[in-house]
């Protein structure tokens, strides 16, 4: 028998040696033992055959086979069986599968439950439906099986040890404990077996766990003598909780008597209730050393501790309701500042409630604390978000004061109607953003432009082109700063020059209106180029999204195809 429960690489090599790949397609393989219900159909008998069970598809005969290969002695195929049509292949246990042969039932006991589950799925999907492997006309044998398999089944000789229901523990030691299972079933009381079966436990499970049932009966034999003891123990714990519940309600009377210590004798009216908590709490009360000997003093101590503890628990509503009577006592005991040790003994007095109450209050405060802590940060973040928009307008304002003439130009640029003449000088700064080499060209062009600045008539048409330029200017702030140095001085001189004659002379000297128009035309294509350049920038994101979606769909298709291929590729079984 192979030492490992799964098929190893050596086992695979042995399997391929005796089941050639040229005429067979291996679907699944696992290490098993072969059992048969023969000659007694009510008992499983181990045949002595074990090895690698292979589910293979014969490509020539177009049918599926069970083939048991001896991987220990390398003796080849020691048993085989053809799968007939509509074969009833059952999974009796996670590790044991059975099916019907010509004369008897056969069963496989798997060494590994994972291999058993995979093998079972393969048999149902493809072994019992070979048409799923290939579509041509299939040749199936009848439910009786072929004649050549009958000798194989008849040659199976049951060994001396015959386990009725093979279990996983029987896999390593054949027939060691299995013969005792029927005796254990017979030793159990039939009424007990019937009651267990009514509770949903099958007879096979009872047989497997017969040792445990017997041991459990022996352990519980001290309390009940009858075999119906197993159902009684579960009923005992069910009766104990109700005793604890009244013990919880019992503390209600103790808080009422604390004002008068003579009322301590009142609890003995219900002795079982105080006795139960005392019996449950001696270990815990051992931590509180004072009230050990007298039970009455324990009750009074519990009442006093309850009174001392009631002040802290008021936050939970349930404790308020329960602690209404002791609140008055708590006020009288409020003079006692050090109740930390009593609450511990008090926690022992009432085990379930105080710790639960204590654990309940702490969570709410941390929840409220983080909630309050989280609320201010979003406010501050929102403020921070609102603050960034303010700096951008401040940035042009700060850059403007750096150059006083530029500040005037910006002021003139804000109102469109009174200051259109100041817009033409903005055209030269537009040239540098288009390309850095144009900066030196803008420097010589600056002298003629200042006199043309005050001219308003030709520029109204250029107004729409000017507004988009300012946003482009802030993109390269360092470049425009050195270039407009010369025009800045000229712009500062513009308000000093008065008289239309000088302006006309300067216009003529600069080349006249035609030159200005040509410059306007040259400025407009730059704006158009910026506008046209923007759409292609926006287009790629849309294409990228579509490409990403398409790639995701393709990946999903490939994954699905791979999963299908994994199911179809049965030659490489693992």
Curated annotation (Swiss-Prot):
Residues 563-574 have a biased composition (Acidic residues). SUPFAM superfamilies: PH domain-like. Residues 144-186, 221-494, 517-574 are annotated as: Disordered. One of its GO terms (cellular component) is mating projection tip. Residues 499-518 form the WH2 domain. Its main location: cytoplasm. Residues 19-130 form the WH1 domain. Gene3D superfamilies: Pleckstrin-homology domain (PH domain)/Phosphotyrosine-binding domain (PTB). Residues 230-240, 251-260, 352-368, 415-485 have a biased composition (Pro residues). Keywords: Actin-binding, Cytoplasm, Cytoskeleton, Phosphoprotein. It is found in: Cytoplasm, Cytoskeleton. One of its GO terms (biological process) is actin cortical patch assembly. The modification Phosphoserine is found at residue 386. InterPro entries: PH-like_dom_sf, WASPfam_EVH1, WH1/EVH1_dom, WH2_dom. One of its GO terms (molecular function) is Arp2/3 complex binding. Residues 149-158, 521-545 have a biased composition (Polar residues). It holds the Pfam family WH1. Has a role in regulating actin assembly, so regulating polarized growth. Interacts with vrp1. This is Actin-binding protein wsp1. The gene is wsp1.
């Amino acid at each position: 028998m192979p030492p490992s429960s799964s098929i190893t690489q050596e086992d695979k090599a042995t399997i391929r040696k005796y089941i050639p790949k040229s005429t067979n397609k291996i679907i699944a393989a696992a290490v098993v033992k072969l059992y048969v219900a023969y000659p007694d159909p009510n008992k499983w008998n181990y045949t002595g055959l074990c090895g690698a069970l292979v589910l293979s598809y014969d490509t020539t005969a177009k049918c599926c086979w069970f083939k048991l290969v001896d991987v220990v002695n390398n003796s080849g195929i020691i048993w085989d069986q053809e799968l007939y049509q509509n074969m009833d292949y059952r999974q009796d246990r996670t590790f044991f599968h059975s099916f019907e042969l010509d004369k008897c039932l056969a069963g496989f006991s798997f060494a590994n439950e994972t291999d058993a589950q995979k093998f079972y799925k393969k048999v149902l999907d493809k072994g019992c439906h070979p048409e799923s492997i290939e579509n041509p006309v299939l040749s199936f044998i009848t439910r009786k099986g072929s004649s050549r398999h009958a000798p194989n089944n008849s040659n199976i000789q049951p060994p001396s040890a015959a386990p009725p229901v093979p279990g996983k523990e029987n896999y390593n030691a054949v027939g060691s404990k299995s013969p005792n299972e029927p005796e254990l079933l017979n030793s159990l009381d039939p009424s007990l077996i019937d009651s267990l079966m009514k509770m949903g436990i099958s007879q096979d499970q009872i047989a497997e766990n017969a040792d445990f049932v017997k041991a459990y009966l022996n352990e519980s034999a001290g309390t009940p003598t009858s075999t119906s003891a197993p159902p009684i123990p579960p009923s005992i714990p069910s009766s104990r909780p109700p005793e604890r519940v009244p013990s919880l309600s019992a503390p209600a009377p103790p808080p009422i008597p604390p004002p008068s210590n003579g009322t301590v004798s009142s609890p003995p009216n219900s002795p079982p209730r105080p006795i139960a908590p005392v019996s449950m709490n001696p270990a815990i009360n051992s931590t509180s050393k004072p009230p050990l000997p007298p039970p009455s003093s324990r009750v009074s101590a519990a009442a006093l501790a309850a009174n001392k503890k009631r002040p802290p628990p008021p936050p939970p509503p349930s404790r308020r309701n329960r602690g209404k009577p002791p609140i008055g006592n708590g006020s009288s005991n409020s003079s006692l500042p050090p109740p930390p040790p009593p609450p511990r003994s008090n926690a022992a007095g009432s085990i379930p409630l105080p710790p639960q109450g204590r654990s309940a209050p702490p969570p709410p405060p941390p929840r409220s604390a983080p909630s309050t802590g989280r609320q201010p940060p979003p406010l501050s973040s929102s403020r921070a978000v609102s603050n960034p928009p303010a700096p951008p307008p401040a940035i042009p304002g700060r850059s403007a004061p750096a150059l006083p003439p530029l500040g005037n130009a910006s002021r003139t640029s804000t109102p469109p109607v009174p200051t259109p003449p100041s817009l033409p000088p903005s055209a030269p700064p537009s040239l540098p953003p288009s390309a850095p080499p144009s900066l030196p060209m803008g420097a010589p062009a600056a002298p003629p432009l200042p006199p043309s600045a005050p001219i308003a008539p030709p520029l109204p048409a250029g107004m729409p082109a000017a507004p988009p330029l300012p946003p482009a200017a802030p993109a390269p702030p360092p470049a425009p700063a050195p270039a407009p140095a010369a025009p800045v001085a000229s712009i500062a001189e513009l308000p000093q020059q008065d008289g239309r004659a000088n302006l006309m002379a300067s216009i003529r000297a600069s080349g006249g209106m035609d030159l200005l128009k040509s410059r306007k035309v040259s400025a407009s294509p730059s704006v158009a180029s910026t506008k046209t350049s923007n759409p292609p920038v926006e287009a790629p994101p849309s294409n990228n999204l579509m490409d990403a979606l398409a790639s995701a769909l393709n990946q999903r298709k490939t994954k699905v195809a791979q999963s299908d291929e994994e199911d179809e590729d049965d030659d490489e079984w693992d």
